[in-house]
UniProtKB/Swiss-Prot annotation:
Descriptive protein name: Signal peptidase complex catalytic subunit SEC11
EC number(s) stated in the UniProt entry for this protein: 3.4.21.89
UniProt record, GO biological process: protein targeting to ER; signal peptide processing
Transmembrane segments: 10-30
Length: 166
């Protein structure tokens, strides 16, 4: 492979990655969420959502209602949680929410940060679920949980890049 072909391959790869990044940032701005698409990682929301479902989020509502399915993050924890709003309170123009997984026996109070009794709608929520695609996100779960699958995928990608004729 000559230098021109290598540069073309590199630029094509850079174009693909930059296009994906721009699409992600565009979705983030439209949905008003730093993470407009998330994958369900546990069975706590069954039967509504299964592990591996991809959720599409929207964070432009000023208020959530009891029964809405929201995604939130807790300080000190990196994985967002998908649960349903169980109760809401208002405190000095702030909407405070208590959530619970559909498949859980108790509310999420034990999941919240220390001394936190409710979620602050403006600070803790990533977004409200507006749509989903079943099981498509399972690939990301396999990649993160199975080392052999991850390295197998990387190996296949490397081999395809190495042996491509374009």
């Amino acid at each position: 492979m000559n230098l021109r072909q290598q540069i073309t391959q590199f630029l094509t790869l850079a174009y693909v990655f930059s296009s994906a990044f721009m699409l992600w940032k565009t979705l983030s701005v439209i949905a008003n969420s730093h993470s407009p698409i998330v994958v369900v990682l546990s069975g706590s929301m069954e039967p509504a959502f299964q592990r591996g479902d991809i959720l599409f989020l929207w964070n432009r509502e000023n208020r959530q209602k009891v029964g809405d399915i929201v995604v939130y993050e807790i300080d000190g924890k990196s994985i967002p949680i998908v649960h349903r709003v169980l109760r809401e309170h208002h405190n000095n123009e702030k909407q405070l929410l208590l959530t619970k997984g559909d498949n859980n026996a108790v509310d999420d109070l034990s999941l919240y940060a220390k001394k936190q009794q409710y979620l602050n709608q403006k600070e803790d929520l990533v977004g409200t679920v507006k749509g989903y695609l079943p099981f498509i996100g399972y690939v990301t779960i396999l990649i993160s949980e199975n080392v052999y699958f991850k390295y197998g995928m990387l190996g296949l990608l490397g081999l395809s890049a190495l042996f491509s004729n374009e």
